[in-house]
From Swiss-Prot:
The keyword Ribonucleoprotein does not apply. It comes from Rickettsia prowazekii (strain Madrid E). One of its GO terms (cellular component) is membrane. This is Uncharacterized protein RP394. Gene3D superfamilies: Cupredoxins - blue copper proteins. The lineage of its organism: Bacteria, Pseudomonadati, Pseudomonadota, Alphaproteobacteria, Rickettsiales.
Amino acid sequence: MDIIKKNKKIIILVCLMFLAIMVYIYKSNGPDKTNDNILEVKITIKDHKFVPNIVEVPKSTKIRLIIHNADDTIEEFESHDLHREKIVMPHESINIILAPLKPGKYEIFGDFHQDTAQGFIIVND
């Protein structure tokens, strides 16, 4: 008990630091208030092709790409234009969040089947 009295200020300081860290973690990883305004775009990989292979979205919109691989083989979703590259295991899905994009045409492709897995995300004005 004597140790607690002597170190009371240190204990309070440590508790306050712990509380500050917990608040920071919550704010960093907490619920995203902008999720209400996120546009979900679903693309399926089927027979080594993107379905649909052209997707149109409005400008200034946060996008969640949901890529589902319906094939029996692995694929790598890739886009140099979007600076994204992600493995999609057979019969699984991945999510890719995109910040609002400027109007334009963004190429996407399957790195393991580049001759067939091709497409575009078109951002309209």
